[in-house]
Swiss-Prot record:
Entries under Pfam families matching the protein: PGM_PMM_I (PF02878), PGM_PMM_II (PF02879), PGM_PMM_III (PF02880), PGM_PMM_IV (PF00408)
One of the record's GO cellular component terms: cytosol
Reactions listed under catalytic activity: alpha-D-glucosamine 1-phosphate = D-glucosamine 6-phosphate
Binding site for Mg(2+): 100, 239, 241, 243
Keywords: Isomerase, Magnesium, Metal-binding, Phosphoprotein
Protein name as catalogued: Phosphoglucosamine mutase
GO BP annotations listed: carbohydrate metabolic process; peptidoglycan biosynthetic process; UDP-N-acetylglucosamine biosynthetic process
PTM description: Activated by phosphorylation.
Highest classification ranks of the organism: Bacteria, Bacillati, Bacillota, Bacilli, Bacillales
Cofactors named for this entry: Mg(2+)
GO molecular function: magnesium ion binding; phosphoglucosamine mutase activity; phosphomannomutase activity
Gene giving rise to this polypeptide: glmM
SUPFAM superfamilies registered for this protein in UniProt: Phosphoglucomutase, C-terminal domain, Phosphoglucomutase, first 3 domains
Organism: Shouchella clausii (strain KSM-K16) (Alkalihalobacillus clausii)
């Protein structure tokens, strides 16, 4: 990770860490790096529903126009919507303003190249060097200054694409949705209604400050209540920028990213559409996920946490399905990044084609008890070299005797250390996790 870029673009508290001044510099430097080879550079900008989005958008636009790029504002749209449209409209670059599942005070800026993929490390390093160096980038004058246009109909083009990934509609399927008061709020309702699903919704009234507030993919228990109350067939919970999905079955049980990937990989294999009989996932996936796929004779490739690393492995090995337990699912046949709405549509299609309820589709995977505790710390990277923390991890691993797993890592986007433990029982899981958390707090706690 660089000075400004984390694992998922530039993030921080809006107007404090991620300031309009920094956004302007990112617009200039990012725009220059991504458009310097283009004769007529065109950059798309989308945002989620955060109150700070328009402030940062204005600064980004100014920076981009100042280097001579044409800017097309997409308005409120999902992150995968920006990625799709960047490639579809042959734009030089795309930019999304969002902090995904983070609280409203945070925001972020992520870039996409003309191919719709996230940037290479080398491109991010070049942008950072330009921000910190003397600004010698072009400053065109007169008619060469960039022009701003709105392209709000881009959302319609993206929704049309989503609908075309399945044949027929979802008549008779009752879907409960939680849009996290974010970018999916209008998109999900329109797409599912056009596909003839019956819809019950929550988290679909964004006001600029309620994004991810006790709703969405990080709080699927709220959707689970709605599914049971409305007797829905399935629940779909998105995050603020709709690049991830957590589902709920008809009984109100949560179906996380691992189970969603298991269901989709199994279906694609049956259809002969799983490239190289392999799915790509991260070290956070549950032991039960790997065991279930072994039984299906599906191979797995494991990467570091972060959908960018999943994507890199997918492109390297020509795999078409990958994702994370958190609900980032990548269908490389359709889009260039994780897409919650696309995942939801594909999941509904599998239910329709197989005639099976979600609970039955997910039943083939038995989840090992897993605890994930986030610890706020002063220096998240110090955890790797702290002798006492590493000592405690080793002690717990010995106690597990091969019947469990530990993963302690710094967050890629927040000042947190994430402690993940899997064990045979819930009690052991909690006990082992707390032992490690206590030492992390003592050594590094904020």
């Amino acid at each position: 990770m660089g000075k400004y870029f984390g694992t998922d673009g530039v993030r921080g508290v809006a107007n404090s860490e991620l300031t309009p001044e920094l956004a302007f510099k990112l617009g200039r430097a990012g725009g220059y790096v991504l458009t310097k080879e283009a004769a007529q550079p065109k950059v798309l900008i989308g945002r989620d529903t955060r109150i700070s989005g328009e402030m940062l958008e204005a600064s980004l636009v100014a920076g981009l126009l100042s280097i001579g790029a044409e800017v097309m504002r997409l308005g409120v749209i999902s992150t995968p919507g920006v990625a799709f449209l960047t490639k579809q409209l042959s734009a030089t670059a795309g930019i999304m303003i969002s902090a995904s599942h983070n609280p409203v005070e945070d925001n972020g800026i992520k870039f996409f190249g003309s191919d719709g993929f996230k940037l290479l490390d080398s491109q991010e390093e070049e942008i950072e060097a330009l921000i910190d160096g003397e600004d010698t980038m072009p400053r065109p004058i007169g008619g060469d200054v960039g022009q701003l246009n709105d392209y709000f109909e881009g959302s319609q083009k993206y929704m049309q694409f989503l609908k075309q990934t399945v044949e027929g509609g979802f008549e008779g399927i009752h879907v409960a949705i939680d849009c996290a008061n974010g970018a999916a709020s209008s998109l999900a309702t329109h797409v599912l209604a056009d596909l003839d699903a019956d819809i019950s919704s929550m988290g679909s009234s964004p006001n600029g400050t309620n994004i991810n507030a006790c709703c969405g993919s990080t709080h699927p228990e709220e959707l689970a209540k709605l599914v049971v109350e409305k007797q829905a067939d399935v629940g779909l919970a998105f995050d603020g920028d709709a690049d991830r999905l957590i589902a709920v079955d008809e009984k109100g049980e949560i179906v996380d990213g691992d189970k969603i990937m298991y269901i989709i990989a199994s279906y694609l294999k049956e259809q002969g559409r799983l490239n190289n009989n392999t799915i790509v996932t991260t070290v956070m996936s549950n032991l039960g996920f790997y065991k279930a796929l072994e039984e299906k004779q599906i191979e797995t490739k494991q990467t570091a946490v972060g959908d960018r690393y999943v994507m890199e492995e997918m492109r390297k090995g020509n795999y078409n399905l990958g994702g994370e337990q958190s609900g980032h699912i990548i269908f490389l046949d359709y889009n260039t990044t994780g897409d919650g709405l696309l995942t939801g549509v594909q999941l509904l299609n599998i239910m329709k084609q197989t005639g099976k309820p979600l609970s039955e589709l997910a039943a083939g995977m038995k989840t090992f008890p897993q605890c994930l505790i986030n610890v706020r710390v002063t220096d998240k990277d110090a955890v790797k070299n702290n002798a006492l923390v590493q000592q405690e991890i080793k002690r717990v691993e010995e106690a597990m005797a091969g019947e469990g797993r530990i993963l302690v890592r710094p967050s890629g986007t927040e000042p947190l250390v994430r402690v993940m433990v899997e064990a045979k029982t819930d009690e052991l899981c909690q006990q082992y996790a707390n032992q490690i958390v206590d030492v992390v707090k003592e050594q590094l706690g904020a």
